[in-house]
Amino acid sequence: MGESFLLLQPASPALSPTPSSLLLGPTITMRADVLIAALATGALVAAVPTSPKKPTPPKGDVSNPFVGKTQFVNPEWSNKLTQTYKSFLKKGDVKNAFRTLQAQKVSTFVWVSRLSELSRIDEAIATARRVQKTTGKKQIVGLVLYNLPDRDCSAGESAGELLSGENGFERYKEEFVKPYAQKVAAAKDLEFAIVLEPDSLGNLVTNLNIPLCAGAVDTYRDGIAHAITQLQQDHVHLYIDAAHGGWLGWNDNLPLAADEFAEVLKRADEASGKKNKIRGFATNVSNYNPLHAVVRENYTEWSNSWDESHYASSLAPHLEERGLPAHFIVDQGRVANPGARKEWGEWCNVAPSGFGPAPSTNTNNTVVDAIVWIKPGGESDGECGYFNAPRAGHWHDEFAQQLVQNAHPSVYENWWKFW
């Protein structure tokens, strides 16, 4: 069965949407009293299930950049959930309207996927600084750097604006990575966790039979290596995208993946003439795998990487053998319900699915730094997988509603902390 996944098409991260207001809409504030009243009457209490047993935190890693920090809540994404909130209220679904309010307070990464979206970094920095000043709590801002030339070479749902045949590589370095790095470097009062180029290196491990991927090898390797060399600040923590367990977690693919990552770091060191650092690797970006599977799916039968925790543990020794850091962050922004997929290769707008466990450093795996939400739930994966799904990156309220309905209890169980 492992062989059948060697050419598995990945989950393509959707392009980020057009920026919106950085302030939460007034509707949320005005309706909060309605929800509190409903809670007081027992309308919500009966609906909230008993929370699962809390995971035990991993042994302390003082270098874990997420420990002691507050993950940045992206108001651009939170504002989009206002539509979902209103949809539930219109249907009289107070319980899920309440859950939506809590989801709006969860941290998500900010995607910078085009030259025109570089301003999102400025907006995130300004907002994080305000929150940090108001709360006195150190902010760690999650960003995604995603604009390689010939991007998304295997799936095509999130193809980018730069082409290697049209001076795309030079534009990537000068017009995208350079200002990106300058903006981040100037904000030394904040911490940053940056995910580098989702899906790209995974495609080089398994999809070189696709002409566009075969032609993108040096562009991908050198592009990511260049980004690494430009983001070597102490307050910046880099995570190279490592696909997910259903893609690179097979025994044959694990050493190949580690070799690919090592090659990129080698190129970064050669290009800069010095040793470059990364914190580790990001897994499950824009996919639907659980960190800790409650039910083992049949299609994972022959894989030791049957959830993302097992994938991280399986990949870690291969990384360490090559002198690479075995630290991970795992995207749990969307997790498929058990039985939602017939095959592991289903990646596009998978349903039923829900918001996964809320971001935390309690991961029950010593190589996993943190649970994070990288892919903003509710933004479409593309025109596939779900009836009438919009283009990649566009808001899909119907899909967002089922994410709320199936949300992990940790998303809303501590509601009283927000009032």
Curated annotation (Swiss-Prot):
Molecular function GO terms recorded: cellulose 1,4-beta-cellobiosidase activity
Catalytic activity: Hydrolysis of (1->4)-beta-D-glucosidic linkages in cellulose and cellotetraose, releasing cellobiose from the non-reducing ends of the chains
One annotated GO biological process: cellulose catabolic process
UniProt keyword Secreted, yes or no: yes
Post-translational modification comment from the UniProt entry: Both N- and O-glycosylated.
Activity versus pH, per record: Optimum pH is 7.
Temperature section of the record: Optimum temperature is 45 degrees Celsius.
Catalytic activity, EC: 3.2.1.91
Main location: secreted
Positions annotated with a glycan in the UniProt record: N284, N298, N364
Its biological purpose: Exoglucanase that plays an important function in biomass degradation by catalyzing the hydrolysis of the non-reducing end beta-1,4-glucosidic linkages in cellulose and cellotetraose to release cellobiose. Hydrolyzes crystalline and amorphous cellulose but is inactive on hydroxyethyl cellulose, mannan, galactomannan, xyloglucan, arabinoxylan, arabinan, xylan, and pectin.
Homology family: Belongs to the glycosyl hydrolase 6 (cellulase B) family.
PANTHER family per record: GLUCANASE, PTHR34876
The protein's name: 1,4-beta-D-glucan cellobiohydrolase CEL6B
Organism: Podospora anserina (strain S / ATCC MYA-4624 / DSM 980 / FGSC 10383) (Pleurage anserina)
